[in-house]
Amino acid sequence: ICDHCGLINYENPKIVAGVVAVWEDKILMCKRAIEPRIGFWTLPAGFMENRETIAEGAAREAHEEACADVEIDALLGVYNVARISQVQIFYRAKLKSPDIAVGPESAEVELFSWDEIPWDSLAFPSVYWALHHFQETKDQALFAPFSEPDDWSQTPGFEALAARYKDD
């Protein structure tokens, strides 16, 4: 609270909106062209903008990062990443066409089958979680949204996240 004017400057968590978007049996992924984790593979996702719904933000990120038009299907997961003050929300989505292209934040975009996913080069633990939660529910019309595991220190990609955001 400002002593002079009484303004309260809230420092709240950031909301990240993303998609696991598919065309037939292939999953859309983007190789990051920006930090953090430049050169690693991720799902289309990014910070929400003012005056948009989470689903709108997720669809916008797919378009910005991979020039992809998606149809949102269902809420997949809500992942609390408290150590970096983020809530990451992913949806299942279907690509309206297989036409994708590199956006300004991506070095490459590709449609991967499950066995082709570059598991050793995933950018963040939430990408791993969302992919596995998608695989678990891809044939289900109804399911409860997932959350992060209680102990995610063994999740691939955790080491890089922990090194970048060490607790003080």
Residue ranges and their predicted role:
Residues 4, 32, 45, 93, ...:
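Active-site donor-binding loop signature of nucleotide-sugar glycosyltransferases
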Residues 48-133, 137, 141-143, 156-168:
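Unchanged
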Residues 7, 25-26, 68:
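Well-ordered beta-strand scaffold positions
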Residues 146-153:
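Short, highly charged C-terminal tails/helix-capping segments
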Residues 1-18:
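Acidic, metal-coordinating catalytic segment for phosphate/diphosphate chemistry
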Residues 4, 16, 37, 44, ...:
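Short glycine/serine/threonine-biased micro-segments
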Residues 22-64:
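Conserved Nudix-box catalytic region and its N-terminal flanking loop in Nudix hydrolases
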Residues 1, 28-29, 42, 71, ...:
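Conserved beta-strand segments that form the floor/walls of ligand-binding pockets within enzyme
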